[in-house]
Amino acid sequence: MRSGDAEIKGIKPKVIEEYSLSQGSGPSNDSWKSLMSSAKDTPLQYDHMNRESLKKYFNPNAQLIEDPLDKPIQYRVCEKCGKPLALTAIVDHLENHCAGASGKSSTDPRDESTRETIRNGVESTGRNNNDDDNSNDNNNDDDDDDDNDDNEDDDDADDDDDNSNGANYKKNDSSFNPLKRSTSMESANTPNMDTKRSKTGTPQTFSSSIKKQKKVKQRNPTEKHLIDFNKQCGVELPEGGYCARSLTCKSHSMGAKRAVSGRSKPYDVLLADYHREHQTKIGAAAEKRAKQQELQKLQKQIQKEQKKHTQQQKQGQRSKQRNVNGGKSAKNGGKSTVHNGNNINEIGHVNLTPEEETTQVLNGVSRSFPLPLESTVLSSVRYRTKYFRMREMFASSFSVKPGYTSPGYGAIHSRVGCLDLDRTTDYKFRVRTPQPINHLTNQNLNPKQIQRLQQQRALQAQLLSQQQQQQQQQQQHHSPQAQAQASTQQPTQGMVPNHFPGGATNSSFNANVSSKQIQQQQQQQQHKSQDTGLTPLEIQSQQQKLRQQQLQQQKFEAAASYLANATKLMQESNQDSHLSGTHNNNSSKNGNNNLMTMKASISSPNTSVNSIQSPPSVNSVNGSGQGVSTGINVSGNNGRIEVGIGNSVNPYNGRIN
């Protein structure tokens, strides 16, 4: 034992010393594994049992089997009682213990004769063993195929013998020998010879198994003058000779085949020619097969069409019969009409092409709208609907220009939860801005034509808005100008009657003429754009020009409005002076004359009117602070008018806005 084992197992050192194999003399063995070699090499001490010990320790009737593991047990089955019996106990069994023979009398001479033959057979087993072994050895020298055939023949012969023996035994023939088969088997399975069973069940000796080793088949090497190196491998074999296989030999490498001398062309060229020749044959055969397959397919299709035609005819006949039977009884008639309609639908069903099927499937997929059964809720439905209603209420409350859509969904839709079919997955609703209404249908127009129409509509909308603004401004200008004319005519009493109103009317007339001209130009441009079709850049340039014209119009209108305000202020100041009674007629005349000269100068912008920027009669009347500071600056070069109007002052030194 090792010290490591002692430490692991916890054995005391005294016990190890007492029971150790070495006992302190010599080196100790590591373990029992070191004794395996000596145990295998030592032969068996007892090959057989001693007869004296058997007689001494066992009964005389006892039978012991020597070496039962190394040698097979030899036994036979009794045909009368079906019990397995050893070869040495068959006679005793038949004489004393066989149940099948107990019913018969022991004095039968036939039974005695059979027992004698069995004894003779058992005694002769030892003599026949050697003969059988020799015969088996001679038979086993043949090839594998011959051995199998011989074994099968032997089995057939044995079966025939068994049948004949059984028949003779049934007839109580004295020549019957039930141990004929057993003796042959016993000879094959003698204890002194190593045996082995074949696949067929027949025993074979150890010597025959050694001789039955399979040999590797090799091609017979041929001589050099018998080989065509242009068609055969031609590699030298180690046994001598050359390989006579074809150029596609798999047992030799490509390098060895290329190194062979004696070829008219290189090996690769010869191999390509070889493949070409064989592939042509293969290609012709493949073409024939393809033609045959096509013919078979056509025949199958014709057969299928014929079957369909026959089925349709049968269905039509059945439907006619059902219609005839349906006229006899009302119930059967109703059923037959239903079946008839189904059959007609089945017969008249249109077969769709694969393209139509794909289009239908794609249409179905595009129109499908799967909705989830459950989704995340960011806010409650109540708050969401309230927010949506309030938003739509505000959107629908504001006024929208004519020709544009309303931003909201409407009075009814704002009260319920709307669903935008264009964007169903959006959690929030889009804010809809007012958009122009398309009165005309744009179904048969190109995208470029649609873009042009939209641009033209935008220009028309701008022009309409400009015209409306101009009309409103003109209405506002007419009312103050009429009042100013009436007020000026009363105090002047015929003095220079045509200067002031003439200037005002001329300015308004000029403004109206200019606006009309601009409108005409815009209309002409619109007609031209509709006829020719302008590009987006040209349309933008036209829009810029229109904006510049609008700015100029606004400037002229602003100047006219300033003049109207100045006249109003002057009238108010004159009324205040008449009420107070402190003004003189001369001063009023001078003031009126100054105003008339000022307006006349304004009506003719080319004249220089620097002297009338602040007349003393207007700014200060009789040295008092009552007056109006107009602050009109006119530049003679450009003809631009800058009007600066101050605040009027009442007699109590208070400003009038």
Curated annotation (Swiss-Prot):
Pfam families: SCA7, zf_C2H2_13. InterPro entries: SCA7_dom, SGF73, Znf_C2H2_13. Residues 107-118 have a biased composition (Basic and acidic residues). It comes from the Eukaryota. Zn(2+) binds at residues 78, 81, 93, 98. It is found in: Nucleus; Cytoplasm. Keywords: Cytoplasm, Nucleus, Transcription, Transcription regulation. Residues 325-336, 469-493, 517-526, 584-594 have a biased composition (Low complexity). Residues 98-225, 287-353, 469-532, 572-636 are annotated as: Disordered. The keyword Transcription applies. The keyword Metal-binding does not apply. Residues 306-321 have a biased composition (Basic residues). Transmembrane segments: none annotated. Residues 174-193, 200-210, 504-516, 572-583, 600-636 have a biased composition (Polar residues). One of its GO terms (biological process) is protein-containing complex assembly. Residues 220-286 form the SCA7 domain. One of its GO terms (molecular function) is enzyme activator activity. GO terms for cellular component: cytosol; DUBm complex; nucleus; SAGA complex; SLIK (SAGA-like) complex. Residues 131-163 have a biased composition (Acidic residues). Component of the 1.8 MDa SAGA (Spt-Ada-Gcn5 acetyltransferase) complex, which is composed of 19 subunits TRA1, SPT7, TAF5, NGG1/ADA3, SGF73, SPT20/ADA5, SPT8, TAF12, TAF6, HFI1/ADA1, UBP8, GCN5, ADA2, SPT3, SGF29, TAF10, TAF9, SGF11 and SUS1. Component of the transcription coactivator SAGA complex. SAGA acts as a general cofactor required for essentially all RNA polymerase II transcription. At the promoters, SAGA is required for transcription pre-initiation complex (PIC) recruitment. It influences RNA polymerase II transcriptional activity through different activities such as TBP interaction (via core/TAF module) and promoter selectivity, interaction with transcription activators (via Tra1/SPT module), and chromatin modification through histone acetylation (via HAT module) and deubiquitination (via DUB module). Present with 486 molecules/cell in log phase SD medium. Belongs to the ataxin-7 family. This is SAGA complex subunit SGF73. It comes from Saccharomyces cerevisiae (strain ATCC 204508 / S288c) (Baker's yeast). The gene is SGF73.
